[in-house]
């Protein structure tokens, strides 16, 4: 049996508490399902700065590059607000993305039936929502040059950011979108602003050409990004996989997440290029929520996003689709049973802490795996 190597980077704040619940699930996957996961641990963020003077050490970066996948908790907190910019905790995540060459960011927006009432939208609009936003992560306006503020010499200044995409960047993210759609409902909606942006014109052309060349079996539609934002709120269930660039993906993924009414419960994945020999992609999985330093150490953090990140890892890095399905079903089942951490609790439900929520999900997962 091939080994499955995981690097766990709990990080700061509630990261270690949430990761502790993931370790329980991994232990079960090994002891009862004999899946052979090998885990290593490392430091990232503020705790890495405290130990090494940098947001992630070279040694832990090497571990990340050698692993089949990385599970990442959260970084940052007031303790490190005054550290130098170049070693700030968030830099650890940025270095992981850069050195692992993770260019595809997957942000699911899933509405658990038991939490449909938490959305600001009508239940009939949101119930059963399951869409995936695929954001290009390493190009576009966040990385384009020049990027500067210049003094015009007349009392005025000019801020410059550059939106730039090359054909290969568009083609490779399009490939990921079409591949993902085949495992879902076989539809991709590509969003850009081709009406006012040349990069949008090229994006549209590149996605269209790639579709015709390699993915004609998948349904493709194009939509202007502003119209896409409107449609996300009007009728989100029309979408399956939304493909878009770095800037629009940043905006649209947060809009889609809040449709579910549970931003802090959603996972994400960042994938790199497929290895030419093994076909495997470098990958990092993390909850969407932050480090929540205000509740760290209190035992009340919600571990669902971290556990759901493990489910994404099982699905996309290891092809363990049945196990991923069961773990996601376990999360939904526990919510159906009325078990809630404080952040999602309401009258009539049972309030539990981090450990109790993790134990409940594991028990449900074990029952589904029997």
UniProtKB/Swiss-Prot annotation:
Cellular localisation: Cytoplasm
Pathway listed: Amino-acid biosynthesis; L-leucine biosynthesis; L-leucine from 3-methyl-2-oxobutanoate: step 3/4
Quaternary structure annotation from Swiss-Prot or TrEMBL: Homodimer.
Keywords (A to Z) from UniProt: Amino-acid biosynthesis, Branched-chain amino acid biosynthesis, Cytoplasm, Leucine biosynthesis, Magnesium, Manganese, Metal-binding, NAD, Oxidoreductase
Biological process (GO), any one: L-leucine biosynthetic process
Family membership: Belongs to the isocitrate and isopropylmalate dehydrogenases family. LeuB type 1 subfamily.
First-tier enzyme category under EC: oxidoreductase
SUPFAM superfamilies for this protein: Isocitrate/Isopropylmalate dehydrogenase-like (SSF53659)
A Pfam match: Iso_dh
Molecular functions per Gene Ontology: 3-isopropylmalate dehydrogenase activity; magnesium ion binding; NAD binding
Gene3D superfamilies: Isopropylmalate Dehydrogenase
Function: Catalyzes the oxidation of 3-carboxy-2-hydroxy-4-methylpentanoate (3-isopropylmalate) to 3-carboxy-4-methyl-2-oxopentanoate. The product decarboxylates to 4-methyl-2 oxopentanoate.
Catalyzed chemical reaction(s): (2R,3S)-3-isopropylmalate + NAD(+) = 4-methyl-2-oxopentanoate + CO2 + NADH
Residues that coordinate or bind Mg(2+): 226, 250, 254
Gene coding for it: leuB
Chief place of localization: cytoplasm
Protein name, as recorded: 3-isopropylmalate dehydrogenase
Record site feature (Important for catalysis), residues: 142, 193
Positions that bind NAD(+): 77-90, 290-302
């Amino acid at each position: 049996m091939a080994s499955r190597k995981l690097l766990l980077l709990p990080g700061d704040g509630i990261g270690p508490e949430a990761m502790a619940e993931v370790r329980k699930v991994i232990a079960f996957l090994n002891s009862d399902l004999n899946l052979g996961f090998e885990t290593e641990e490392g430091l990232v963020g503020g705790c890495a700065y405290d130990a090494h003077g940098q947001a992630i050490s070279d040694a832990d970066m090497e571990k990340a590059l050698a692993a089949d996948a990385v599970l990442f908790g959260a970084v940052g907190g007031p303790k490190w607000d005054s550290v130098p910019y170049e070693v700030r905790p968030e830099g650890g995540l940025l270095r992981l993305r850069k050195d692992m060459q993770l260019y595809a960011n997957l942000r699911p927006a899933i509405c658990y039936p038991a939490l449909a009432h938490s959305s600001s939208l009508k239940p009939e609009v949101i119930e059963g929502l399951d869409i995936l936003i695929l954001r290009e992560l390493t190009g576009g306006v966040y990385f384009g040059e020049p990027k500067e503020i210049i003094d015009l010499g007349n009392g005025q200044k000019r801020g410059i950011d550059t939106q730039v995409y090359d054909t290969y960047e568009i083609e490779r993210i399009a490939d990921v979108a079409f591949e993902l759609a085949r495992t879902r409902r076989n539809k991709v909606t590509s969003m850009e602003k081709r009406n006012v942006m040349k990069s949008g014109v090229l994006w549209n052309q590149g996605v269209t050409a790639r579709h015709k060349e390699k993915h004609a079996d998948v349904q493709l539609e194009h939509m202007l990004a502003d119209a896409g934002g409107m449609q996300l709120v009007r009728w989100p269930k029309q979408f399956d996989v939304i493909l878009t660039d770095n800037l629009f993906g940043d905006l649209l993924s947060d809009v889609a997440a809040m449709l579910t009414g549970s931003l802090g419960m959603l996972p994400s994945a960042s994938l790199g290029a497929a290895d030419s020999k093994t076909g495997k992609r470098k990958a990092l999985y993390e909850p969407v929520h932050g480090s929540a330093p205000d509740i760290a150490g209190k035992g009340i953090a919600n571990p669902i996003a971290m556990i759901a990140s493990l489910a994404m890892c099982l699905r996309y890095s290891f092809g363990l689709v049945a196990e991923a399905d069961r773990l996601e079903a376990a999360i939904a089942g526990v919510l159906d049973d009325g078990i809630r951490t404080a952040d999602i609790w309401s009258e009539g439900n049972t309030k539990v802490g981090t450990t109790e929520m993790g134990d409940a999900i594991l028990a449900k997962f074990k029952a589904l795996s029997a």
